[in-house]
Amino acid sequence: MNFDLTNRRVLVGGATDGIGWSSAKLFAAHGANLILLARNDKKLEDRASELSAITSNKIQTLNVDFTKPEELEHKLSQFLLSQSLEVDIVINNTGGPPGGRLDAASSNELISAFNMHLISYHKILGVVSKGMKERSFGRIINVISTSVKQPLNGLGVSNTIRGAVANWSKTLSNELGEYNITVNNVLPGATNTSRLNEIIRNKAQKQAVDKQLVKDGMASEVPMKRIAEPEEVAYAILFLASEYASYINGINLPVDGGRTKSL
């Protein structure tokens, strides 16, 4: 299969680390022009330099904060307008909310999570969807979580917001399909990212055990008996962004080694 993304422009959220960074590298390797989104200028600059060293594709960066959706919308729209750029593919990806029980979460924690995920993604949609409709092409891929299918213990706020994003996505897939815009979700399971390492560290501290013991326990719950690498999730994103997935719309695709028990 030839995943040729030459002349496609891809907006990558959370592009300096984990699944976002793995996706950026993979899409660049297949010919895409990239706009990397993150909130750390130094990391953005470093990542852009790394990509520019291995590809002649256009690599651009934009410092945005997903906790401030109004500011994100303004920055992105001005960035695209000032350079007459259009976006073909969006990878919505940002860090998860803090862990904890849902019944102990404050309303501010829920509001913050909704802003960081659902509202920010909706703001991005508002900026890019008009051009996608005019060109009769678009791919919107949301990196969320297997908690959409099976809530995860100790991640109450995350479970709540991921479900909201999944339903937002499904609704959009019904509304935008006629414009040849597909909207799909990728649901990573336990993946070797800084987010997972944070969860492991916090769980180990609470249980007063070694971090490796917690990590091994997570891996033991997966039929494949290991934790995923970010690149394995990125390949699923690449497929959904490609022409090979032109008739795949409105799905939740688990990339979890079979850990989720539901169909």
Regions found by a protein language model. Name each.
Residues 141-165, 169-178, 190-191:
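Catalytic loop of short-chain dehydrogenase/reductase
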Residues 210-211, 222-233:
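A conserved structural motif in NAD(P)-dependent oxidoreductases
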Residues 93-98, 258:
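Conserved NAD(P)H cofactor-binding loop of Rossmann-fold oxidoreductase domains
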Residues 32-47:
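Conserved glycine-rich Rossmann-like NAD(P)H-binding loop of the short-chain dehydrogenase/reductase
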Residues 96, 103-123, 137, 141, ...:
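Catalytic Tyr-X3-Lys loop
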Residues 4, 19, 150, 237-238, ...:
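Short C-terminal tail/terminal secondary-structure segment
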